[in-house]
Amino acid sequence: MTDLRHYDVIVSPVITEKSTMVSEHNQVVFNVARKATKPEIKAAVEALFGVKVTAVNTAVRKGKVKRFRGLIGRQSDVKKAIVTLAEGQSIDVSTGL
């Protein structure tokens, strides 16, 4: 049974040219909560998608500085998780949870 906390950990799938390329190597890319840890991300992916996760790599993309009408603002930082799945496992990220 999935815990409601798992839905707070995984924010959205990342669908870019680079994430499509790594999907050929049994990897899936997600935007995750800023405070999520690797064990939490692993547990959430295994519970929500029913797959076996072998590794989780994370990276924090710093937000860009933007200007609007002379005011300087900053976009939020985004944490990205590259999840490696066990051999033969796959996730279709084009469908919803």
UniProtKB/Swiss-Prot annotation:
GO molecular function: rRNA binding; structural constituent of ribosome
One GO BP annotation of this record: translation
GO CC annotation: ribonucleoprotein complex; ribosome
Keyword annotations from UniProtKB, A to Z: Ribonucleoprotein, Ribosomal protein, RNA-binding, rRNA-binding
HAMAP family: Ribosomal_uL23_B
A Pfam family that the UniProt record links to this protein: Ribosomal_L23
InterPro entries, per database record: Nucleotide-bd_a/b_plait_sf, Ribosomal_uL23-like, Ribosomal_uL23/eL15/eS24_sf
Assembly behavior: Part of the 50S ribosomal subunit. Contacts protein L29, and trigger factor when it is bound to the ribosome.
Protein's name in the database: Large ribosomal subunit protein uL23
PANTHER family: 60S RIBOSOMAL PROTEIN L23A
Family label: Belongs to the universal ribosomal protein uL23 family.
Functional description taken from the UniProt entry: One of the early assembly proteins it binds 23S rRNA. One of the proteins that surrounds the polypeptide exit tunnel on the outside of the ribosome. Forms the main docking site for trigger factor binding to the ribosome.
